[in-house]
């Protein structure tokens, strides 16, 4: 049985509801040899075998149980002006904003009413503004990086990421609306809606970033071996622009 066939079989076991810890323990030796590209190809195979794309999206978090974090290794060998290094840097900054959002939300949830002098509301508006402005990050992925995977026949993983971008955008804009309209809202209603948005964004965006760092980006680096392509992607990246983070070059 080929490596991809074995890995597809493992993913099918996860789809059937088996404990990912048990599956990983049973296949530990084999899983130590898989690459992010192997996982991306196996996910594509599941789609070709009839798996609903929505189900693949649910499974992606379980698939991460099979991988070690690739971020540090990529940052070690990529030049700082490489498009993947830039995207990784933007991810780091976005994660910092998520940490701030978590802290600010917890503080606001303890309040008994809107107090405009409290710094938490200014911080919430700043965080929401920065997250909305991170649209340029998604644009670079959707217009530049994902098409490179699709050129090599990998449509499933980028499709899942695009769908998540749509959900993330909707909730980021909702957060921005709440931050701008808190003074006009019933405060209890504001607290409920804020907590719901944060409860969605925090795990969704963190998992999304982890999957891109550990499946999408490493797979793109493995598949695209033409330096001229990466040079052109960097030029296109400059054309689109940057959010939260700018490269040195």
What function would you assign to each model-found segment?
Residues 1-135, 139-249:
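Small-residue-biased structural context
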């Amino acid at each position: 049985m080929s490596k991809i066939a074995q890995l597809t079989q493992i993913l099918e076991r996860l789809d059937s509801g088996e404990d990912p810890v048990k599956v990983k323990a049973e296949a530990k030796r084999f899983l130590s040899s898989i690459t992010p590209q192997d996982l991306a190809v196996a996910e594509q195979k599941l789609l070709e075998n009839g798996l609903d794309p929505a189900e693949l999206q649910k499974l992606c978090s379980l698939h991460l149980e099979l991988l070690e974090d690739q971020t540090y290794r990529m940052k070690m060998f990529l030049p700082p002006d490489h498009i993947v290094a830039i995207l990784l840097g933007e991810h780091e900054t976005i994660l910092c904003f998520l940490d701030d959002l978590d802290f600010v939300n917890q503080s606001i949830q303890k309040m008994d009413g809107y107090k405009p002098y409290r710094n938490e509301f200014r911080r919430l508006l700043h965080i929401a503004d920065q997250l909305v402005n991170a649209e340029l990050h998604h644009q670079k992925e959707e217009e530049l990086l994902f098409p490179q995977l699709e050129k090599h026949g990998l449509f499933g993983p980028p499709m899942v990421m695009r769908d998540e971008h749509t959900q993330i955008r909707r909730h980021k804009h909702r957060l921005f609306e709440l931050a701008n309209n808190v003074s006009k809202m019933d405060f209890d209603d504001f607290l409920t809606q804020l907590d719901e948005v944060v409860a969605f964004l925090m795990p969704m965006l963190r998992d999304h970033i982890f999957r891109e760092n550990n499946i999408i980006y490493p797979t793109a680096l493995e598949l695209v071996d033409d330096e001229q392509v990466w040079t052109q992607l960097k030029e296109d990246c400059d054309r689109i622009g940057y959010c939260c983070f700018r490269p040195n070059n």
